[in-house]
């Protein structure tokens, strides 16, 4: 593979995460405007965004098999056509059914693109470099989550219709589409070059189960925590502005942590540092949940920084459980994380209704403790060390 080709594929990976981050995180900014557009209460409008999450989940799950049937370049180019149709649907339709369908299509495109982006990084980079590259790639999710809400605020403040926000997000896919030209993608399944050697079916092992449970619990815990921090902070007498600042500080610290750990991870065994980070994150969340408002700003900054590397390290370790990175395995771990996203309000909503926001935060804390236990148990069964030794020879 030529260096320029590798750079193009890496940028496709970066932008695939930026696309998903923009679509998921911008929701809260535009929901009120969309509710007004359809003359609906915000509470019922929020349910239609489940179609976006459902599209992401289904496409990540199915793409584990589709990757071996449909070439990656074809998928990305077809995704561009779907993106144009979805944004056009948002712009020109006043039907809630068509809006929901467009959201589902955006989710499908986003999920397919992100699963391809993740696979490209695991395919192109080996060992510890794979972990640091995946982490840097994931930072584009957070970066888009900071940039696109600002773009949305800029447009909405000038009374520009909400659907132009999605048109701006579509420009990310335009860049991906342009990068596919003159770019060679790894061939998989029936498109892969034929070899005389028999294909070895490699068992995943129990380590993949531990990592999948960790991925689900981590994302469910993180989103369950950050979704209810504003309500919890307001209950302690903080202003809405200060409560919002806590969430902003978390994501800012999270992004800085990703950049820092993309360098730091190269010097440590991934399973050991993952266990340490998961333990630290559980402790810091407990400090936030039980501490006084005076210490909340510092503890959430520390939590954002030290938890930033957990999810991508889980995915990296998953990809290292087999000698050759398996798209099915990587997508399985990603799917478990996405299920965590889908379950966020299903799990935390009833808890808040019956016991208040702090109960939801303590539940999230318990989920982080489960992540720590899974990472600790992984140390006894993980195959990443033997596969790293093989690739280094």
Swiss-Prot record:
Location of this chain's protein in the cell: Cell inner membrane
Any single Gene Ontology cellular-component annotation: plasma membrane
Entry-linked PROSITE patterns: MFS
Main location: membrane
Entry keyword Transmembrane: yes
Membrane-topology descriptor: Multi-pass membrane protein
MF term (GO), any: transmembrane transporter activity
Stored CDD domains: MFS_FucP_MFSD4_like (cd17333)
Keywords: Cell inner membrane, Cell membrane, Membrane, Transmembrane, Transmembrane helix
Transmembrane segment boundaries: 11-31, 51-71, 78-98, 101-121, 134-154, 162-182, 206-226, 245-265, 273-293, 297-317, 332-352, 361-381
Entry-linked PANTHER family: L-FUCOSE-PROTON SYMPORTER, PROTEIN TSGA
Family that this chain belongs to: Belongs to the major facilitator superfamily. TsgA family.
Protein name: Protein TsgA
Organism of provenance: Escherichia coli O81 (strain ED1a)
Gene name of the encoded protein: tsgA
């Amino acid at each position: 593979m030529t260096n320029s080709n590798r750079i193009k594929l890496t940028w496709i990976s970066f932008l695939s995460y930026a696309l998903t981050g923009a679509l998921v995180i911008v929701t809260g900014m535009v929901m009120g405007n969309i509710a007004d557009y359809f003359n609906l209460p915000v509470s019922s409008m929020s349910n239609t965004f489940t179609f976006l999450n459902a599209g992401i989940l289904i496409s990540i799950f199915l793409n584990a098999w589709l990757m071996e049937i449909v070439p990656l370049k074809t998928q990305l180019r077809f995704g561009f056509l779907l993106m144009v149709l979805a944004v056009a649907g948002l712009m020109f339709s006043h039907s809630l059914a068509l809006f929901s369908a467009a959201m589902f299509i955006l989710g499908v495109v986003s999920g397919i693109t992100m699963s391809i982006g993740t696979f490209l990084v695991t395919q192109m980079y080996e060992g510890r470099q794979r972990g640091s590259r995946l982490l840097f790639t994931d930072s584009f999710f957070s970066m888009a989550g900071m940039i696109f809400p600002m773009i949305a605020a800029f447009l909405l403040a000038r009374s520009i219709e909400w659907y132009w926000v999605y048109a701006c997000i579509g420009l990310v896919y335009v860049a991906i589409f342009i990068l596919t030209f003159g770019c060679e993608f790894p061939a998989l399944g029936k498109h892969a070059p034929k070899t005389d050697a028999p294909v070895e079916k490699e068992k995943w092992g129990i380590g993949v189960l531990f990592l999948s449970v960790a991925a689900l619990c981590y994302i469910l815990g993180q989103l369950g925590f950050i979704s209810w921090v504003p309500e919890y902070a307001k209950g302690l007498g903080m202003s809405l502005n200060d409560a919002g600042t806590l969430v902003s500080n978390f994501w800012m610290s999270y992004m800085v942590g990703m950049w820092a750990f993309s360098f730091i991870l190269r010097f440590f065994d991934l399973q050991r540092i993952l266990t340490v980070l998961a333990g630290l994150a559980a402790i810091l969340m407990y400090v936030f949940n039980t501490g006084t408002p005076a210490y909340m700003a510092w503890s959430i900054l520390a939590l954002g920084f030290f938890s930033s590397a957990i999810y991508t390290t889980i995915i990296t370790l998953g990809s290292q459980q087999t000698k050759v990175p398996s798209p099915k395995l990587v997508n399985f771990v990603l799917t478990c994380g996405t299920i965590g996203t889908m379950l966020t309000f299903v799990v935390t909503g009833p808890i808040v209704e019956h016991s208040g926001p702090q109960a939801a935060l303590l539940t999230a804390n318990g989920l982080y403790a489960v992540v720590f236990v899974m990472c600790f148990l992984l140390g006894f069964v993980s195959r990443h060390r033997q596969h790293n030794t093989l690739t280094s020879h």
